[in-house]
């Protein structure tokens, strides 16, 4: 499996670099937000310590188990898979902060690649990571500023809506064109796959609205 993974990395090195840059950017956003709250509240505990790192490993393991148990959905082409790995990621984020959440999401994808490799030239893996972060980061930031049950609920609802809007737009603007280019598959062919499932799909916008958005809503609920 490792040889296949290294071969995939060599074949898609530019895209892999883009993935790493995006991951670093999300980590820095989470770190800056958490650092602000730590200073504001006078919290002396470090953002990352031995206990947190151990718990990040535990939640990452739970997340990757749920991630590899993904399954296709009837309203989208078969390369779209639904999983519930955001549950342990969200719990870890609420418990230990947004930096821990981003690290859980990253470790989940890294472990999955080591176990199963990639079947989408890393496009699906980037999508899962970035869209997952678009859910847990808003949710955790809303909760972080005032840790109450109502804020947690508001955070989850807001995170779901943001993930749905962002995930839909990210698919249309970047992920689907990247998938099309990496696999040499015309974008129209991908849209046609959606049209076979749902007659309402007539173009890229209707594809992401009818095939991608419902899946992101399900992930958040």
Language model regions located:
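Loop-helix junctions at membrane interfaces
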Residues: 1-221
């Amino acid at each position: 499996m490792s040889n296949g993974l290294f071969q995939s990395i060599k074949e898609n090195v530019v895209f892999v670099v883009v993935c790493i840059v995006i991951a670093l950017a999300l980590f820095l956003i989470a770190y800056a937000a958490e650092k602000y709250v730590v200073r504001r509240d006078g919290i002396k505990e470090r953002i990352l310590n031995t206990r947190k790192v151990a718990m990040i490993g535990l939640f990452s393991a739970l997340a990757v188990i749920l991630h590899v148990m993904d399954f296709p959905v009837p309203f989208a082409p078969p390369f779209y898979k639904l999983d519930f790995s955001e549950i342990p990621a969200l719990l870890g984020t609420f418990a230990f902060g947004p930096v821990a959440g981003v690290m859980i999401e990253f470790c989940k994808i890294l472990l999955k690649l080591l176990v199963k490799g990639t079947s989408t030239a890393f496009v699906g893996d980037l999508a899962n990571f970035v869209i997952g972060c678009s859910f847990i980061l808003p949710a955790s930031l809303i909760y972080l500023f005032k840790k109450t049950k109502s804020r947690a609920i508001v955070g989850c609802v807001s995170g779901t809506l943001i993930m749905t809007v962002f995930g839909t737009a990210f698919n249309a603007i970047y992920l689907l064109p990247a998938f099309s280019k990496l696999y040499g598959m015309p974008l129209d062919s991908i849209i046609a796959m959606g049209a076979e499932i749902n007659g309402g799909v007539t173009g890229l916008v209707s594809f992401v609205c009818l095939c991608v958005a419902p899946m992101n809503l399900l992930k958040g609920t």
